[in-house]
């Protein structure tokens, strides 16, 4: 073992990363752009001890069953794991035939996602379909004592969080049933997410989305959290995840894939440090 001199240092609990493509992601540029399964060392060296695995664009050559198997394997290696049942598409893939049954009957399934909205890769489903799957997840969570949440992938579309407002408009489904993620991908979406969170909803930043220069519309996670807090968003309604091991496709103005990268999970640790050292949050608030 290695002994580390800890004088003057801070020891904190391992991070929970609620958005990790543990069996890989991508494929938007063809089969050669599929990212591989994640290795345990990529998770632990980023300070993460709990991961929530999920599928993304590809619900055809990747399966929820494989996701569950990978989650069990990682837990056997020493970390805690959970998964979402589903993918971008609607109807979304499951193990038992329904989101509700997956959540109730499979111990590791805590919700569904990531369901794509406001994105050219979504199924372009009507709001009624999104409302139905949110209700399925909620009831599944109630029956099993789980969160039963919907992880909602929000793209660059101009609708931003319009669907979330319509899903909850009649007041039956709580605004906290869905977790809109990637809210810092552009300034328009970020502003809409702040309004949504101030009205009682949640907002999830993606730490691996980072601006390349001053003209980039992407909002840096640590700076965005500071801005959201200053705008009056309660800390308890803000979260950060990495999108680790997922693909980072680059599209032109016509939606054509022109490049791809892989998201790093260690971005979570970097943004945590920046929250404390650059944005002035206390250690306890940054960990909340």
What are the functions of these language-model segments?
Residues 6-69:
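Metal-associated gating/positioning segment near the N- to mid-region
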Residues 14-16, 150, 240:
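Residue-level marker for buried hydrophobic side chains located in beta-strands
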Residues 230-288:
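His/Asp/Glu-enriched, well-ordered alpha-helical/loop segment
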Residues 8, 19, 43, 47, ...:
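Divalent metal-coordination and catalytic microenvironments
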Residues 204-234, 239:
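Long, well-ordered mid-to-C-terminal structural blocks that present hydrophobic/aromatic surfaces
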Residues 43, 71-74, 193-196, 228, ...:
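Generic structural signal for hydrophobic
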